[in-house]
C-alpha cells in the first residue's frame, strides 16, 4: 500500500515491518563466524513481533536457495556493516564526552540495552507510539535492562517531535549524538530537509550526527525493494518495500548539512565495508546496480 501523509503502523505492518526485517538481519549477523556485531536481543524481538517469515528466518526454519538466498545474504551483510558503523559512532561520541544521544525512528534498535554507555548517559528513542509501546513491552518480557537511562518519545516524526523530545527532558544546550539510520528513504524530500533543520536547531556546538544517503533513490532502491518484495512474497511476507520509499529530487544530505553549520565527512559504502575487513558484495547477483549502490555514502557530521 502506498504511503500517505497520515499513515501509521506497528512492527508487523508498513514501515514498522522493515524494522522487524532489519532486526532479523541483525540476529542472523550476530551468529556468524567473526561477527561484526552482537545483538543478543534481536532474535527475541523478531519472535515477539510474530511475522512468520522473519521468525522462521532467525530460527533457521526456512530453506532459501538461489536468488532468495542471495537476497537474504545481501541483507544480512549490509545490515551487519551498517549496524557496526552506527554502533561505533555512538561509542566514539561517548568517548568524546557526549552523554546525550537520540535514536530517530528507533524501531527495534536495542542500543540502549546492549552498548556499554558511560555513567550518566541518557538515550532518547523516538518512534510512533505503537512501535515504542511494543518494543518496551517486549524488552521487559525478555528481561532486558537498559545500560543507559532510556527515555522514550512516542511521536511521529512528521509531528512536532522536537517539542515532545524537550518534554521528555532533552537539553538542547548539551552536545548530542544523533543517528538517523535507514531513515531518509522513508521521508519525502522536503521532510528530509525539515528533519535536518530540526536537528540543527536542537544541537549545541560539538553535537554529532550520523546518517546515510542514497543519491539515486528512485531508480535503484525502489527497483531493489520491489524485486526483494516479490521474492519474499512467496514466503508469506506481503509488504512491498518499494511502496514505502519516497523518490523525487532531494538535497544531498552531506551538502545540506554542510550548508547549515555542520562539518561533514562522507565515506562511500564500499569504503565502510573495507574498514571492517569486509568486501562489498556483488549486487548483480540479486539484479541490483553495483555502480549506483556504490555511490551511497555514510555520513558523520559535527556541529560547528
Swiss-Prot record:
Keywords: Methyltransferase, S-adenosyl-L-methionine, Transferase. S-adenosyl-L-methionine binds at residues 127, 156-157. SUPFAM superfamilies: S-adenosyl-L-methionine-dependent methyltransferases (SSF53335). This is Putative S-adenosyl-L-methionine-dependent methyltransferase MSMEG_1481/MSMEI_1445. It comes from the Bacteria. InterPro entries: Ppm1/Ppm2/Tcmp (IPR007213), SAM-dependent_MTases_sf (IPR029063), SAM_mthyl_Trfase_ML2640-like (IPR011610). Belongs to the UPF0677 family. It is an enzyme of class 2 (transferase). GO terms for biological process: methylation. One of its GO terms (molecular function) is methyltransferase activity. The lineage of its organism: Bacteria, Bacillati, Actinomycetota, Actinomycetes, Mycobacteriales. Exhibits S-adenosyl-L-methionine-dependent methyltransferase activity.
